[in-house]
Amino acid sequence: MNWPALKERINLYEKLMRLDKPIGILLLLWPTLWALWLSALGRPNWIVVWIFILGTVLMRSAGCVINDYADRDFDKHVERTKERPLTAGKVTTKEALALFAGLSLLSFLLVVFLGNTLVIWLSLPAVFLAASYPFTKRFFAIPQAYLGVAFGFGIPMAYAAHLGEVPAEAWWLLLANVFWAVAYDTEYAMVDRDDDLKIGIKTSAITFGRFDVAAVMLCYGVTLAIIGGIGYSLNRGPAFYAGLAVATCIMGVHYTWIRGRERMPCFKAFLHNNWVGLSIFVGIVVDFLVSGRNLW
């Protein structure tokens, strides 16, 4: 294979892994970083941090590949997805499965490098969740909740990496992530609702129906309440809650965008959730930095 052909192949694989659309990586990364900082009380092991960041990129990429494999017959009927490499026939199903297996193997090797038995065991359901999520859209009324577990499974793994155990706090944080994922992915599903109804797949936007906007805002509220409760249980300071306050304001802006149920504003709100995750993370980091200097 000559260089131009190889370059074109690499570009197709990059698109299949959605490396050109990093929002999914960020939505997966922020909860993992929350957990790494909270579990280490603001002093995470930097080797662990970098391994989790790289693992997040690899597993999100693997998730995109298997998602396109599962949805290849549906995507051709959706305007936004009909040109994806697998659906368009530019990448074969064998190539996609091989790429998914390779990315999953690399992620597992990263976990093995940590040398933590509990993290290794937790990586097994993490891979299962990533691989099985795309198929839940065929029978589960709110597959976004399943996505929240899959996207958030780095949380218990992060606690296990730092503490050697997974305390209740980690599971509460995972639950918060489930509600956050239902919120932002419902916004995403609102974009494709008409197409999804035609092809017969299930989404939260369809299930919630005319209560979709209210459901999004309720899920946002539960997310903030759970994270706030975690902060209270850990005796966190003003900066922690300031991060939540900023996130609350951002969520309020999202309401103004999604209440009209128009495609582009809903998609804009989905993308904007990056700033929700970042705001919460900055609040956590700053709070630990300030409390470490006894400034509160």
Curated annotation (Swiss-Prot):
Bilayer topology term: Multi-pass membrane protein
InterPro entries found in the cross-reference section: HB_polyprenyltransferase-like, Prenyltransferase, UbiA_prenyltransferase, UbiA_prenylTrfase_CS, UbiA_sf
Gene Ontology annotations for the cellular component aspect, listed alphabetically: plasma membrane
Keywords from the UniProt entry: Cell inner membrane, Cell membrane, Magnesium, Membrane, Transferase, Transmembrane, Transmembrane helix, Ubiquinone biosynthesis
GO BP term, pick one: ubiquinone biosynthetic process
Required cofactor(s): Mg(2+)
Superkingdom of the organism of origin: Bacteria
Pfam families: UbiA
Subcellular locations according to the entry: Cell inner membrane
Pathway(s) per entry: Cofactor biosynthesis; ubiquinone biosynthesis
Job of this protein: Catalyzes the prenylation of para-hydroxybenzoate (PHB) with an all-trans polyprenyl group. Mediates the second step in the final reaction sequence of ubiquinone-8 (UQ-8) biosynthesis, which is the condensation of the polyisoprenoid side chain with PHB, generating the first membrane-bound Q intermediate 3-octaprenyl-4-hydroxybenzoate.
Protein name per Swiss-Prot or TrEMBL: 4-hydroxybenzoate octaprenyltransferase
Gene: ubiA
